[in-house]
Amino acid sequence: MFDDIPVSVGPMNEGERVRGPDMYVELAGPKSYGFELVKVVNKAEDKVEIIGKDIDEMEEGSRNPFAIIVEVSGSNLEEDLEGVLERRIHEFLNYIEGVMHLNQRDQVWIRINKDSFNKGLRLKHIGKVVQRLFKAEFPFIEKCDVTIITDPEKVKEELEKAREIYNKRDEKTKALHEEDVDVFYGCVMCQSFAPTHVCVITPDRPALCGGINYLDARAAAKIDPNGPIFEIPKGECLDEKLGIYSGVNEVVRERSQGTVEEVTLHSALEKPCTSCGCFEAIVFYIPEVDGFGIAHRGYKGETPMGIPFSTLAGQCSGGKQVPGFVGISISYMKSPKFLQGDGGWERVVWLPKELKERVKDAIPEELYDKIATEEDVKTTDELIKFLKEKGHPCAERIGAEVEEEAIEEEEVEEEMEEVEGIEVPTMTLPGTFAGLPPGIKIVLYNAVIKAEKIIITKEEPEKKKKKKK
């Protein structure tokens, strides 16, 4: 596409993954820090500037702080377009051969592979590509400056300023709700990585990447009608609490190639929305307490279930619809409709301390101290104890379930006594079942409700009787 860029640039490179062994350097990401930002200014100068080390000055295999700030100017540009334009950085960087871009805002994660580095790719080339693609895709951008920062202290300094801008954008949509509008928006920008994912954006549910709210999406659909963000007619409200709309289902069905038939906007248990991989946080169901934990991308520890964020991410990313798991933005946690189909904040039992503090104002005051963090509990057993001690709403259900199980167990024992001598139903399975050897019998007790016991015994084959001569 560009003669002065040493690698190919275009949509054919979208979806390319850069694995660890193929990586030359990593920029920002979970083991470092960084951000991306677009700002509308009065007068840009069409310059590309690098502050800090370029790629060839970095150690191979290293992880480095990174920031990219794009300043655009034009007579028809408005500040409301910043978030929309900013999200396109994801697309433009993935156009570059050997560059993998994931996530958004202050969660950005970039890898550059060895082949592209060896071909001569440097940060100045990346800056030029971003600059040219912005001007080519959006003719109303007259001038575009791109500043790439790798100096650690400078990245930290600018990161705090960027976060203030992100928060300011998110505040704008608070007065608008789903019942106030007739149109929602969809985004398929991540389908190069998650082919069946359709992100549904409403006034009460920002994009799960956290980079696009309802007003951003509306602006994006207007300035680029054929782009990845489009209108979704709301249609008939089939279930207000769960957030089921006929128009949403129709569009999701079409855009997911028929893979997803129906979605609920505000439930993690019943037909949740699909997730790509750019989500800021994951809601996950904890069956032992009939409640939810939420882990954000920056959390490096383990959840009470004994697994980290990275493992949870693998459960629901890639455009899958997985009941019990759903990717969300942190802004959605501040929405009045947050998981309302599942009980909202009363169903949340665990958060990392950092995330809990970050959304403190959104958590009902009477629940704040009843939600555990990694400092309070390490296991589900400890979580159960914590919830009971604190009087969390979920603790009532835990007690009720235990009592119900005890009653059922007594009833079963009484029934078994009454019909003493009856043969317990058994099931002989094929030898290949679950990797078991042949000749194994599995006996299920009380299997009408659940499997209370599994007894594995070796079944000796009957000896063949010798025929009399």
Swiss-Prot record:
* Cofactor(s) this protein cannot do without: [Ni-Fe-S] cluster
Q: List the disulfide bonds.
A: none
Q: What's in the keyword line of the UniProt record? A: Acyltransferase, Iron, Iron-sulfur, Metal-binding, Nickel, Transferase
Gene Ontology molecular-function annotations? acetyltransferase activity; anaerobic carbon-monoxide dehydrogenase activity; CO-methylating acetyl-CoA synthase activity; iron ion binding; iron-sulfur cluster binding; nickel cation binding
InterPro entries from the UniProt entry: ACS_CODH_B_C, CO_DH/Ac-CoA_synth_bsu, CO_DH/Ac-CoA_synth_bsu_3_sf, CO_DH/Ac-CoA_synth_bsu_arc, Prismane-like_sf
**Mind listing the GO biological process terms from this record?**
acetyl-CoA metabolic process
Q: What is the reaction catalyzed?
A: Co(I)-[corrinoid Fe-S protein] + acetyl-CoA + H(+) = methyl-Co(III)-[corrinoid Fe-S protein] + CO + CoA
What sort of enzyme, by top EC class, is this?
transferase
What residues does [Ni-Fe-S] cluster bind to?
187, 190, 276, 278
Q: What is its EC number?
A: 2.3.1.169
* Cofactor: binding comment: Binds 1 [Ni-Fe-S] cluster.
Q: What does this protein do?
A: Part of a complex that catalyzes the reversible cleavage of acetyl-CoA, allowing autotrophic growth from CO(2). The alpha-epsilon complex generates CO from CO(2), while the beta subunit (this protein) combines the CO with CoA and a methyl group to form acetyl-CoA. The methyl group, which is incorporated into acetyl-CoA, is transferred to the beta subunit by a corrinoid iron-sulfur protein (the gamma-delta complex).
Family per similarity comment: Belongs to the CdhC family.
Outline the subunit composition.
Answer: Monomer. The ACDS complex is made up of alpha, epsilon, beta, gamma and delta chains with a probable stoichiometry of (alpha(2)epsilon(2))(4)-beta(8)-(gamma(1)delta(1))(8) (Potential).
Q: What is this protein called?
A: Acetyl-CoA decarbonylase/synthase complex subunit beta 2
Q: Which organism is it from?
A: Methanocaldococcus jannaschii (strain ATCC 43067 / DSM 2661 / JAL-1 / JCM 10045 / NBRC 100440)
